Amino acid sequence: MMNESQPKLKYKRILLKFSGEALMGKSQFGIDPSVLDSLARDIAELIHMGVEVGLVLGGGNLFRGKALSQAGVGRVTGDHMGMLATVMNALALRDALERIDLPARIMSAIPMLGVVDPYHRRKAITHLRNGQVVIFAAGTGNPFFTTDTAACLRAIEIGADIVLKATKVDGVYSADPLKNSDAKRYDYLTYKEVLTKGLEVMDSTAICLCQDQGMPLQVFDMAAPKALKRIVTGERVGTIVGANHDQ
């Protein structure tokens, strides 16, 4: 519940996209419990400010389809396995949230009776309004679509104000800043600029979906101090992608 002493919110309902790789921390595989706990605390701070939080997690920390594809596993099978990996991550995050007494629901695009709830748009919105964190799992439920696209789709469906993509760098660059010291970081980009420049913000399907529906994106470094709190109160952190540079 927000009180008068708290800062004014620019974004009341957000969709946070968190990669599976980010959950590994400094490990090469799996889930780092300290990363989960840190993410849970950051989300709790937003909930206590009155922000409604939906999440989509990737699955790259538990499953890497490229290696299996090279071994002959079909793309559809690999994508389904990746969807299951996102459910595993969602279960871990829900547990971390519940350990700090923050109610959370998992809604999966693939029905898993007795494990998680099936995705239902209207119920998801009700949960958000009631102060529960909603974790959307299993992508879109269809192969050939990334979790970035799933995040944008769910954000549009639930009427989120913005999609926040947490990464390991502080925004979008013209080139890989780890390989090119001349790489330029952008403060603002339009959807068209992202597509024409071939910038690695999200896949083109996700960007086009946001462009068609006017859904803004913000790419930021999850390790930046109080990043989420600063963003929801209107501070520019990282790179903003929208219809124009005045987003």
From Swiss-Prot:
Its EC number is 2.7.4.22. GO terms for cellular component: cytosol. Pathway: Pyrimidine metabolism; CTP biosynthesis via de novo pathway; UDP from UMP (UMPK route): step 1/1. ATP binds at K17, F18, S19, G20, G60, R64, T167, Y173, D176. Its main location: cytoplasm. HAMAP family: PyrH_B. Catalyzes the reversible phosphorylation of UMP to UDP. NCBIfam families: pyrH_bact. Homohexamer. Belongs to the UMP kinase family. This is Uridylate kinase. It comes from Legionella pneumophila subsp. pneumophila (strain Philadelphia 1 / ATCC 33152 / DSM 7513).
